[in-house]
Each structure stands twice: as C-alpha cells, then as structure tokens.
Amino acid sequence: MKTSMQRKLDQLSTRLAELNDLLSRENVTADLDQYRKLTREHAELGPVVEQYALWRQSRSDEAAAQELLADPSMRDFAEDEIRSAREGMARLETELQKMLLPKDPNDDRNIFLEIRAGTGGDESALFAGDLLRMYLRFAERQRWQVEMMSESASDLGGYKEVIVRIAGQGAYSRLKFESGGHRVQRVPATETQGRIHTSACTVAVMPEADEIGEVEINPADLRIDTFRASGAGGQHINKTDSAVRVTHIPTGIVVECQDDRSQHKNKDRALKVLAARIKDKQYHEQHAKEAATRKSLIGSGDRSERIRTYNFPQGRMTDHRINLTLYRLEAIMDGDLDELIGALVTEHQAELLASLGEAD
C-alpha cells in the first residue's frame, strides 16, 4: 500500500475515534443539525476504518508468519499463511481504494428524470412511455417515491416529454449514468409490412437542488406565463389558466407544468425543475474542460451522445459506452436494471482509479 494512502487511512481512523468521543457526550443532541452531521460522517467513516483494521491485521499475520520461516518444521505452514495474508491484503487494498474515491457531491440527492421523444414520431413517443415505465418499475424495486412533475402526452399514447421527481436513498448515484440518447429498434404496432423501425429518445437525470435558493435565480430573469391546461375535456375540463410556463431568459430554459389544478402548485413545481435544469447546465459547463482533457466513457451525461440501443427483435440491450450486451431485454424493460447499473458503476470506479494513478 502506498504511504500516502496509509497516511490518509490513519487520519480517518483518528477522526473516527474523535467522532466516537463526540457522539458519546451527554449534550450531543443539543444541536440537532450538528448531531446529524456527526452521525452521517460516522456512518461514512466506519466501514472504511473497519476495512483498514482488517488490512492491518493481515499485515500483522504476514509478519508473524515471516518469523516462522526460520523453523524448518513450520516452513510449509508459514508459506501458506504468508500467501493467504498477502491475498487478503491485496483484496482489502482494492476495496479501500474504491472507498477512498472522490465522492460525487450529488450522489445522495433526489433527482428529476426527464424523457423526451426524439426522431421517430409516434413510435419515439411510445418508447418514451416504455422508458418511463422501466424507470418507475426500477424505482418501485428500490422503494423510492415518484412524483409526476410535467407530462406532454402524444396522440397515440406515450409522451412527447415527461418529467418525474424520484426521491430516495441513492437515486442520483444509481441513475446518473442514464443521461444520453436511447435508441430503439423494433416493429411498431402500426407497421403492416413487419419492417423494423429505428427511433430515439433522450434522457436527462438532474440532481434536485436542496432549496431553490441554492441556485441563484434573479426574479427579473424570469418570464412567467399562465395558460389553460390542455386535456381530453369532459367534466374535469380545466376552465382556468392554471398551467404555468416559466422561461429563464439568460439561458433560454423553458419549463411547463400543468398537471395540478392549482396554478400556485404548478408554478412551484416548474421553479423546482428550472432550478435543477440550471444546476445541471452549470455542472456540465464546469466539467466540460475536464472532459476535454480526459475523455470519460460513461461520466459525460451528454444528452446528444447515443449511449444505448434496445433491439426488440433480438431481445438485446447494448450499452455502447462499455460494450455491454445483455440478452434479457424483457426483464430490463420491466425495471431489472441492477446488472446494467452495476457494470456502469464498476467502469466509472475503474476510470477514477486510473485517473488517480495518473495523478500520482
């Protein structure tokens, strides 16, 4: 293990001991915000220090076995112990490297998931609906909460655009690699000749701002229009201008919300989505220079980049960033994304480790 890494782990061990002391004091809950901060830090450091303790134990085991080598009767036993200890140290060191990787500050945030139909007309809109169902089924498996923020339905079903808020532990860290172009190849229900059509949708995963105030938005930069919500009519036809369109003039970002009958609620939702879009734009601009110097295969989140193909006739899904093909499309479309997401996270960790190695 590198000296710099060992020094870092020693510092974390010392810090954990300090946290244990602070959390054992009688007045620790006097300041609840500080208490939550300390318990969160303790929860993050605990597993790292525990792994480091196991690594140090393996190192001690190796040192003890080295001393036995001088005894001919113990040589075979000692060599087995040394080999076992070194294998354990190598495995633990790899785990510790991953644990020490820079943490994405957005990983613990809730998200806004935006799906837009692209090329392919009605078929693209139908596929947008299929993608939404896929993510909602995945969210259901994770016991995450889902809230519809905005939807623009197409005539034949599906969506021209849909935005949902997903709240739950790990929402952003698990879904952040879904941003990009999603292509589908299949025979549309309206196709009489049995020809395979290709269409596409774009997905954007945006971390939710803790508070709207976290993103600086000058009210003078906003144009807010109200209009009558579109609907199928009938007894629930919306007779008031409850739908809201918010335009952020400096960036040209436009958000519409019309799902609620309350204009106030629609405006509140639109401002939350707008804050997330501005934050997302700032994040990508900030990382553009880094991306230019070190091409990341999966971390760019560029919506124009085609990241995945869903081929229904062959029952396969291919993620082009990591050259992964899975022949279990039906399960994937039903929200079984663990294998795919796990592979993307592993590749991202490998990229981070490689970049840290270059920095060293």
UniProtKB/Swiss-Prot annotation:
InterPro entries given in the database record: PCRF (IPR005139), Pep_chain_release_fac_I (IPR000352), Pep_chain_release_fac_I_sf (IPR045853), Prokaryotic/Mito_RF (IPR050057), RF-1 (IPR004373)
Compartment(s) of residence: Cytoplasm
Entry GO terms, CC: cytoplasm
Domain of life of the native organism: Bacteria
Changes after translation: Methylated by PrmC. Methylation increases the termination efficiency of RF1.
N5-methylglutamine: residues carrying this PTM: Q235
A GO term, aspect molecular function: translation release factor activity, codon specific
Keyword set, alphabetical order: Cytoplasm, Methylation, Protein biosynthesis
Family annotation (Pfam families): PCRF, RF-1
Keyword Cytoplasm: yes
Family annotation (NCBIfam families): prfA, PRK00591.1
Role, per record: Peptide chain release factor 1 directs the termination of translation in response to the peptide chain termination codons UAG and UAA.
Family the entry assigns: Belongs to the prokaryotic/mitochondrial release factor family.
Protein known as: Peptide chain release factor 1
Organism encoding this protein: Burkholderia cenocepacia (strain ATCC BAA-245 / DSM 16553 / LMG 16656 / NCTC 13227 / J2315 / CF5610) (Burkholderia cepacia (strain J2315))
Lineage: Bacteria, Pseudomonadati, Pseudomonadota, Betaproteobacteria, Burkholderiales
